[in-house]
């Protein structure tokens, strides 16, 4: 799948196509997004990058590092794709998502969110779909806010609770806990 129109056609013509994650045990036809990769747009001065779902973390990091920037969430396996990280993550990643492009079950191409930090367009579908395992729609593109590398490097990644938890969220949680619960009463 190298184009949106190919993906839309495949979804429209599918009878046994079921959107699944690689963790599902099924005989249904899987939709492999790995060939649909690359940077759609990158605005280093705005701290925003839009990536196709099949783009590997490694490939995205190479682009970001050229401008001394990094994702604000932690990913242990750099071979995973942006789409798979999006589909299997939780709220840690959703804090970084600005917008998405999806194909719904009818084959319609839909855009949600945008490329700005503040979005007041109603329901935040882009964040709702984080962790949905790709079962609600085919995620084709994702826009992320990124941070300067020096900000991310100052965070203590050893304290990150899960593979995909945001180091920034972890650091903020740790500091808030020290202020609001200095004696460790609440677990």
Give, region by region, the residue ranges found by the protein language model.
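A short glycine-/small-residue-rich loop at the edge of a beta-strand within enzyme catalytic domains
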Residues: 51, 116, 167
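Glycine-rich N-terminal segment of FAD-binding domains in flavoprotein oxidoreductases
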Residues: 1-73
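Short conserved micro-motifs on helix faces and helix-strand junctions that flank
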Residues: 51, 131, 178-179
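FAD-binding subdomain of flavoenzyme oxidoreductases
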Residues: 57, 66-158, 186
